[in-house]
Amino acid sequence: HLLDFRKMIRYTTGKEATTSYGAYGCHCGVGGRGAPKXAKFLSYKFSMKKAAAACFKYQFYPNNRCXG
């Protein structure tokens, strides 16, 4: 949940998530649409999608690689 994530950032860093990190990362416009701003983030986005796909294919039966 996005609000929980915001609270976690505030608790962990002491910073307001929206003003401190709102323009950071792969956010490329309203709704996250658009291409990543740097090659670093494009690579990161690909890695995250690959990891999510590896876990989601096992969502209906146990998989030791997916924790959390």
Curated annotation (Swiss-Prot):
Q: What keyword terms does UniProt attach to this protein?
A: Antimicrobial, Bacteriolytic enzyme, Calcium, Cell membrane, Disulfide bond, Hydrolase, Inflammatory response, Lipid degradation, Lipid metabolism, Membrane, Metal-binding, Mitochondrion, Mitochondrion outer membrane, Phospholipid metabolism, Secreted
**What cofactor does its activity depend on?**
Ca(2+)
- What biological-process terms (Gene Ontology) are attached? arachidonate secretion; defense response to Gram-positive bacterium; inflammatory response; intestinal stem cell homeostasis; killing of cells of another organism; lipid catabolic process; phosphatidylcholine metabolic process; phosphatidylethanolamine metabolic process
* Record-listed E.C. numbers: 3.1.1.4
According to the UniProt record, activity depends on pH as follows: Optimum pH is 8.5.
InterPro entries from the entry?
PLipase_A2, PLipase_A2_dom, PLipase_A2_dom_sf
Q: Name one GO cellular component term.
A: mitochondrial outer membrane
Q: Which reaction does it catalyse?
A: a 1,2-diacyl-sn-glycero-3-phosphoethanolamine + H2O = a 1-acyl-sn-glycero-3-phosphoethanolamine + a fatty acid + H(+); 1-hexadecanoyl-2-(9Z-octadecenoyl)-sn-glycero-3-phosphoethanolamine + H2O = 1-hexadecanoyl-sn-glycero-3-phosphoethanolamine + (9Z)-octadecenoate + H(+); 1-hexadecanoyl-2-(9Z,12Z-octadecadienoyl)-sn-glycero-3-phosphoethanolamine + H2O = 1-hexadecanoyl-sn-glycero-3-phosphoethanolamine + (9Z,12Z)-octadecadienoate + H(+); 1-acyl-2-(5Z,8Z,11Z,14Z)-eicosatetraenoyl-sn-glycero-3-phosphoethanolamine + H2O = a 1-acyl-sn-glycero-3-phosphoethanolamine + (5Z,8Z,11Z,14Z)-eicosatetraenoate + H(+)
Tagged with keyword DNA repair: no
Q: Which GO terms describe its molecular function?
A: calcium ion binding; calcium-dependent phospholipase A2 activity
What family is it from? Belongs to the phospholipase A2 family.
Q: What is this protein called?
A: Phospholipase A2, membrane associated
Question: Organism source for this protein?
Answer: Oryctolagus cuniculus (Rabbit)
